[in-house]
A protein has these predicted regions:
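A noncatalytic interaction/capping subdomain that flanks phosphate/NTP-handling catalytic cores
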Residues: 1-104, 114-123, 130-187
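Conserved lysine of the Walker
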Residues: 108
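Hydrophobic positions on the alpha1 helix immediately C-terminal to the Walker A/P-loop
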Residues: 111
């Protein structure tokens, strides 16, 4: 019902050249993605506390609208369980995960590829959107069905050893971030 709809965000989805609206109403969450080419919008609805959703998406829609819609709804369902997907690339090395965060085009996939090529035992866990889950005793990183430039769909997990925020620069440097910088790097 439009009368009780509350818009939470409006944003662009460049992968499908679409404009997105995300909001809530009395029944739950609503995600609507409208392609700029004039084709039919894709809508997803998920009730509060539900683990399932409904959509009007059809085989004629851009597949990116399906992948992104399911990713958003997965995050809504996973958050109360202490889990969230992060835009990052993850290496597993010696049984622990190292997440590389950064804006698109920063070199996350390149960085993890270089680890695999030059560090024996380094393997890719996920290349775009791993799931991070906090338990009472540790933080874990899980592979996911969403991968990036390098197809990698592993149903595996490991404890997190480090989170590295990448930025492009004319020099190589690494430093530990202060706590407030760390929060900003994750968000």
């Amino acid at each position: 019902d439009e009368a009780d709809y509350r818009e939470l965000d409006i944003f662009e989805f460049p992968d499908a050249d679409a404009d997105c609206r995300f909001g809530t109403d009395a029944a739950g969450y609503l995600l609507e993605m409208t392609p700029r080419d004039g084709s039919a919008p894709a809508r997803y609805r998920m009730a509060y506390g539900a683990a399932a959703a409904r959509s009007d998406i059809t085989p004629g829609h851009n597949p990116a609208l399906f992948r992104f819609g399911v990713w958003i709804l997965f995050n809504i369902a996973a958050l109360p369980l202490g889990a969230v997907a992060f835009h990052s690339s993850v290496i597993r090395y010696r049984g622990r995960g190292v997440l590389f965060l950064g804006e698109s085009g920063t070199g996350k996939s390149t960085h993890t590829r270089l680890w695999r090529e030059h560090i024996p035992g380094a393997e890719l866990l996920n290349d775009d959107s791993p799931i991070i889950r906090a338990t009472d005793s540790e933080a874990l990183v899980h592979g996911s069905p969403w991968s990036g430039k390098t197809p990698c769909y592993r149903n595996e997990s490991c404890p997190i050893a480090a989170v590295v925020r990448l930025s492009q620069a004319p020099h190589n440097r690494i430093r530990r971030l202060r706590p407030i910088e760390s929060i900003g790097a994750l968000l």
